[in-house]
């Protein structure tokens, strides 16, 4: 067992913010695609976007380039908290079980990934709610991050800021429990087999693989989570479209079909792919710094 290392926390946060800035417009189109077509919500009933590219072009044309970065402030704040805690906790937990990366197993990595994903996502949930609300509003957004934070708290209370926290934790458990172990195992296999060295090309291939695995595993939960977070629940007023996460899942499947659970898959993957590539390459380079 080794002492707590602060570097994974700092490097994880910096790499997460870098990756978020580079892929944010794709994440915004994913949110817009996922909230549209809800039969029980008049505001989002219309199918405005045919796909990711159409969404980007239409948002740019109708709302301006700035709208593609609606919610970037809470997104960066989220990565500064979520990304920092996620990577730091994951790496620290692994060192509790084994001292050397070569001794890590898939079971250990999955367990550490799931636990770190749940802890970090629960802490960072308010920033996730803010990001999704601001992304969905686009050019109609009123006030900045602080103003929207206060508005949610005043109208919906503390529950509003932690809306969808169970789904966020479930999604994080799936994403982190899949992505980080897949990256580690892929990288380890490529290096130990002699196919590739510990180079940027290995980091690229491993991060591409883990991004695809994460998107396939998490998209249904992501759709339900997005819709639950975007749903307003005014205190003392019963006007919710969905009674809970299971109800949201069943209504989405019943009203829109099974593949509605994979709405936004392409932007989800096209975001997770580049996001993970940028993140892991940045993270691996930061690890080489002699600090």
Swiss-Prot record:
Record function comment: Antiporter that transports inorganic anions (sulfate, sulfite, thiosulfate and phosphate) and, to a lesser extent, a variety of dicarboxylates (e.g. malonate, malate and citramalate) and, even more so, aspartate. The sulfate/sulfate exchange is much higher than the phosphate/phosphate and malate/malate exchanges. The transport affinities is higher for sulfate and thiosulfate than for any other substrate. May catalyze the export of sulfite and thiosulfate (the hydrogen sulfide degradation products) from the mitochondria, thereby modulating the level of the hydrogen sulfide.
Protein name: Kidney mitochondrial carrier protein 1
GO biological process assignments: inorganic anion transport
Top-level taxon of origin: Eukaryota
Membrane topology label: Multi-pass membrane protein
GO CC terms, sorted: mitochondrial inner membrane
InterPro entries reported for this sequence: Mit_carrier, Mito_Metabolite_Transporter, Mitochondrial_sb/sol_carrier, Mt_carrier_dom_sf
Family affiliation: Belongs to the mitochondrial carrier (TC 2.A.29) family.
UniProt entry tagged with the keyword NAD: no
Annotated organism of origin: Xenopus tropicalis
Cystine crosslinks: none
Keyword annotations of the record: Membrane, Mitochondrion, Mitochondrion inner membrane, Repeat, Transmembrane, Transmembrane helix, Transport
Catalytic reaction equation(s): sulfite(in) + sulfate(out) = sulfite(out) + sulfate(in); thiosulfate(in) + sulfate(out) = thiosulfate(out) + sulfate(in); sulfate(out) + phosphate(in) = sulfate(in) + phosphate(out); oxalate(in) + sulfate(out) = oxalate(out) + sulfate(in)
Repeat positions for Solcar: 7-96, 104-189, 198-289
Record's subcellular location: Mitochondrion inner membrane
Main location: mitochondrion
Segments crossing the lipid bilayer: 9-26, 71-89, 106-124, 164-183, 204-224, 264-283
Molecular-function GO term, any one: solute:inorganic anion antiporter activity
Gene: slc25a30
């Amino acid at each position: 067992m080794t002492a707590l290392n602060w570097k994974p926390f700092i490097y994880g946060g910096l790499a997460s913010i870098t990756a978020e800035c580079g892929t944010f417009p794709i994440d915004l189109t994913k949110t817009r695609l996922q909230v549209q077509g809800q039969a029980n919500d008049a505001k989002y009933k219309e199918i405005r976007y045919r796909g990711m590219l159409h969404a980007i072009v239409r948002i740019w044309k109708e709302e301006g380039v700035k709208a593609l970065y609606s919610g970037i402030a809470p997104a960066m704040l989220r990565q500064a908290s979520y990304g920092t805690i996620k990577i730091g906790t994951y790496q620290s937990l692994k060192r509790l079980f084994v001292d050397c990366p070569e001794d890590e197993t898939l079971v250990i990595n999955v367990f550490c990934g799931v636990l770190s994903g749940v802890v970090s996502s629960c802490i960072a949930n308010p920033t996730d709610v803010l990001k999704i609300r601001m992304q969905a509003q686009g050019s109609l957004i009123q006030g900045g991050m602080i103003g929207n934070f206060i508005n949610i708290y005043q109208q919906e209370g503390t529950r509003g800021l932690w809306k969808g926290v169970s789904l966020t934790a479930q999604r994080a458990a799936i994403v982190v429990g899949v992505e980080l172990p897949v990256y580690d195992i892929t990288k380890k296999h490529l290096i130990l087999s002699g196919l590739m060295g510990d180079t940027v090309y290995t980091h690229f291939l491993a991060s591409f693989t883990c991004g695809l695995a994460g998107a396939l595993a998490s998209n249904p939960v992501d759709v339900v989570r997005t819709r639950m977070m975007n749903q307003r629940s005014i205190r003392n007023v019963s006007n919710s479209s969905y009674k809970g996460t299971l109800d949201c899942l069943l209504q989405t499947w019943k009203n829109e079909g099974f593949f509605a659970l994979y709405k936004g898959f392409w932007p989800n993957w096209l975001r997770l792919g580049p996001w993970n590539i940028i993140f892991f390459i940045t993270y691996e380079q930061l690890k080489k710094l002699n600090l």
